[in-house]
A protein has these predicted regions:
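Positively charged, low-complexity terminal tracts
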Residues: 1-83
Length: 83
């Protein structure tokens, strides 16, 4: 899916999964996305059902995604997030 949005173009290359559901039909998704025909990046953000509208999110390069995975891989998230 390649969609122009103003000056912004995006293509969801692969949906890796949904990590949360909103109350208005939006879902927080982890996707591999190409922005403006550039190299694909890992993307975490809210999307509406048709992927025509999006919320603010986080986009990570391959190096950043690997560093993030390493950072949280050893955490006990239940303990860390209970603070």
């Amino acid at each position: 899916m390649s969609e122009p949005r103003g000056d912004l173009q995006f293509e969801i290359m692969k949906n890796l999964g949904v990590i949360g559901e909103g109350t208005k039909g939006w879902s927080k998704e982890v996707n591999v996305v190409r922005w403006n025909n550039r190299r694909a990046k890992l993307d975490i953000r809210d999307w509406n059902e048709t992927h025509e509208k999006m919320g603010r999110g986080v986009t990570l390069s391959a190096d950043e995604a690997c560093a993030f995975k390493e950072l949280i891989g050893g955490l006990d998230l239940a303990l860390e997030l209970s603070v």
